């Protein structure tokens, strides 16, 4: 199965307190959550460690569920759904079927 959202994708938040913000996906977690750059910022209290790190309040990005974001179409710059197209490619003298992610609005392949 091909993942609909991968790290490095440009996404837009469609629900929640950060609605309308755009960011790049840093990590995709196993429980259908994403860490998006600049979105879902929370304050975290950090203890001092023995290595000299200071105690204090740090801003970090919290995970957001994948149903609350949409991938931005590279051609139209609008949020779009993601589809999967099966293509046949010749690699090393053999024909292999490959699943490719495609933006539904423009039909353009996603990287």
UniProtKB/Swiss-Prot annotation:
GO molecular function, one term: rRNA binding
One Pfam family hit: ribosomal_L24
GO biological-process terms attached to the record: translation
Keywords: Ribonucleoprotein, Ribosomal protein, RNA-binding, rRNA-binding
Matches recorded under SUPFAM superfamilies: Translation proteins SH3-like domain
Entries under InterPro entries matching the protein: KOW, Rib_uL2_dom2, Ribosomal_uL24, Ribosomal_uL24_CS, Ribosomal_uL24_KOW, Translation_prot_SH3-like_sf
GO cellular component term of the entry, any: ribosome
Family as reported in the entry's similarity comment: Belongs to the universal ribosomal protein uL24 family.
Job of this protein: One of two assembly initiator proteins, it binds directly to the 5'-end of the 23S rRNA, where it nucleates assembly of the 50S subunit. One of the proteins that surrounds the polypeptide exit tunnel on the outside of the subunit.
Subunit architecture: Part of the 50S ribosomal subunit.
UniProt-listed HAMAP family: Ribosomal_uL24_B (MF_01326_B)
Record's protein name: Large ribosomal subunit protein uL24
Organism the protein comes from: Bifidobacterium animalis subsp. lactis (strain AD011)
